[in-house]
Amino acid sequence: MPDLSWQDWPFFDPLHRELARELEAWCGPALAAIDHRDTDAACCALVRSLGQAGWLRYAVPAGPGGGWGGRLPKIDSRAVCILRETLARHDGLADFAFAMQGLGSGAISLMGSDALRQQYLPPVARGEAIAAFALSEPEAGSDVAALACEARADGDGYVLNGEKTWISNGGIADFYCVFARTGEAPGARGISVPAPGRGGAGLQAGHDDAGHLPRLGGGRRA
């Protein structure tokens, strides 16, 4: 049995302790039902299961009137730690699936327009949309100041031009938070984050020549 004495630490409140107990009881039977022979399919199944059980509501904020789908007014780091530690102990991919829902939609949670928040965050919380965080590039890696991907304003949207790589959930995500250069400011300034959906014209998701690095590229209106 895991040591759960940490639940008595003073910086956890009754909500966190109840969360830990309920999640522990859920993990065993729910995660045992996931077939891991196909990693992408397993990840999709885990997102659905986590969403249906309500755990993904801790990955996004509630928003005004609860309209963004979250369980709490703000994302609670203590709740996230409890969820990730418990999920990882039972199934590492379950922890990954939860974490990527939060990371992939994080830019929208923190700085997105009301329209983007209302469009994307509720389905993320329900496990009906898979999110991806598209920052790294073949030449720049994760050096934001050296990003080459560009987003050019076009009417009421943007045209994206560039390539991303090492994208977790690449190929299975329903939308991508793509870090792209929209201004002439040097370095990390002038960076914006359009959020194109899967299947749009010009958006290509696949793997590298070795078959194992998810990539995202092409020109895409977002």
Where are these regions (language model features)?
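Intrinsic disorder at enzyme termini
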Residues: 1-19, 151
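Buried hydrophobic positions in well-ordered alpha/beta secondary-structure cores of metabolic enzymes
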Residues: 16, 83, 113, 133, ...
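Internal helix-loop-helix
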Residues: 53-118, 122-128, 169-175
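Short Gly/Pro-enriched turn/cap motifs at secondary-structure boundaries
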Residues: 97, 139-142, 166-169, 182-185, ...
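A short, Trp-centered hydrophobic/proline-enriched beta-strand micro-motif
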Residues: 127-135
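Cytochrome P450 C-terminal beta-domain/meander region
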Residues: 143-161
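Flexible, small-/acidic-enriched active-site or ligand-binding loops
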Residues: 146, 201-222
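A short core secondary-structure module
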Residues: 157, 161-206
